[in-house]
Amino acid sequence: MCEFKVKLSSENNVKDVCQDVLYAKIEENIILRDVLGTTNTVESAIITEVSVPSAKMTLLYSPILKNILKLLKFQTKCYEEGKFDTKMTEIWEAIKKEGDSFINSLQNKLGK
């Protein structure tokens, strides 16, 4: 069995999240479960690397990802139900607003 050590990368920072992880699931958040059955939830992140030989999993954090994952969840729901959910439009507007803020913040930090 392969237990993973999970790291979270954000901007120029990498930190350990948990270890001995056997299970990972992406919903609106990433749900991680270790060998003892302890569950850790990581918000606004995606899995960027899984390496069995190194027994490591790397996650990327960005605040904008929370609503992107939510949008994808609602998209799946729409297809399953065969109808459009107006909540998709609300989430999309939130993503655009967060995207503008994200770009402005990056420009302020790094220059234009």
Q: Residues of each region from the PLM?
A:
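Short, cationic low-complexity segments
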Residues: T76, G82-K83
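Short secondary-structure transition/capping segments
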Residues: T76-K77, A94
